């Protein structure tokens, strides 16, 4: 006779195809917790950035958790992929500093712009345009995007703990930070520990490292302190003003605002699409043609999350590259994403706990994932010289410009021009050329973020 737990495990396994994809329920939950810890910083960073632009931080905190929670749960249930949704940091910065502070657009109009961006983004996804872009993504550029994102993660993590800093002097743009600081030492030691644990195939090695460093930080770092467990979420500021449903769609249709909406859409299309492709590839969730399994559902969920963001008062949403931390921990199904979503909904009431995980506890995980993504170099076909070089150009300029879309644009342009100059124009397809022209025009017109 089967026990209730066995039946539960069986139903989970059947729904999420856990065994079929070579995983276990425990492995998926650990992967989800790993991803959550790697991206929980967003509930602090996003309210802080939008708060500088006049958004009520407490209300933004709630909205950020709702977007990440519900978006990730839908991704898991519908697309069955280990991809976590959250408010995109780059698009949050654009919303706060360019739209509101730079163009002096009101908060309701900015939220209307986010909503319109989400609607256009969803139309592009639902009509198959995003899938078409993925089908016309050259192999070199696709693998180069994965390499570039890996390098980008390494730079983000190293800069976040002060290992690499902006050069205060003339010369190169970056410089070595203070190597002897506690965050830097903990990050590098943590990276080495993760590598050792992964070599030994210790289950949940990344998660154990994050928890271990957090405990060390709580003991020795005065900036990490226990301030309680529970806190009731607030949907409005101290004056009772709520962001939910406060968007001004008609204001966002103003000709002055529309170019910014289109810039958000173009950036999201290529940034998020490249991220989803890279993380799915890292998790071996591509079919025999190199396309994402149930990719259409993932792309639509990703875009619809931005519609929800505009309604509840948050920044545009996107799949987080930190999802790769979960796939590195073994996540292969939507149960990973659902775990992330449930944890974000719980953190609504446990917000003090989010401050117990310092940046230097998650930095080693991001560094390790970045290193893993560099393995995409081995997937590049160097027998096709132009395609291979375009891929490497994509990778290098993603990290040099700190912008995924810019790297993809330069990679596409390099491929098309390289094919023409080398006499290999017959290898080009119309889709690749159209995307290259669209991206170059987007940048030449000054609309890029």
From Swiss-Prot:
Effect of residue 271 to A/N: Strong decrease in activity
Protein keywords: Cell inner membrane, Cell membrane, Membrane, Transmembrane, Transmembrane helix, Transport
InterPro entries in alphabetical order: Azg-like (IPR045018), NCS2 (IPR006043)
Chief place of localization: membrane
A molecular function (GO) term: purine nucleobase transmembrane transporter activity
Protein's membrane topology: Multi-pass membrane protein
Effect of residue 275 to S: Strong decrease in activity
Membrane-inserted regions that do not cross the membrane: 386-421
Superkingdom of the organism of origin: Bacteria
Outcome (variant: residue 322 to D): Strong decrease in activity
Record-level GO cellular component terms: plasma membrane
Spans traversing the lipid bilayer: 26-49, 60-78, 81-97, 110-129, 142-162, 181-198, 203-222, 255-283, 297-312, 315-330, 335-349, 361-380
Compartment annotation: Cell inner membrane
Effect annotated for changing residue 35 to H: Lack of activity
One GO biological process term: hypoxanthine transport
Coiled-coil region: none
Residues exposed to the Periplasmic side: 50-59, 98-109, 163-180, 223-254, 313-314, 350-360
Segments on the Cytoplasmic face: 1-25, 79-80, 130-141, 199-202, 284-296, 331-334, 381-385, 422-449
Impact after mutating residue 322 to Q: Lack of activity
Family, per entry: Belongs to the nucleobase:cation symporter-2 (NCS2) (TC 2.A.40) family. Azg-like subfamily.
Described purpose of this protein according to its UniProt entry: High-affinity transporter for guanine and hypoxanthine.
Protein name in the entry: Guanine/hypoxanthine permease GhxP
Gene transcribed to yield this protein: ghxP
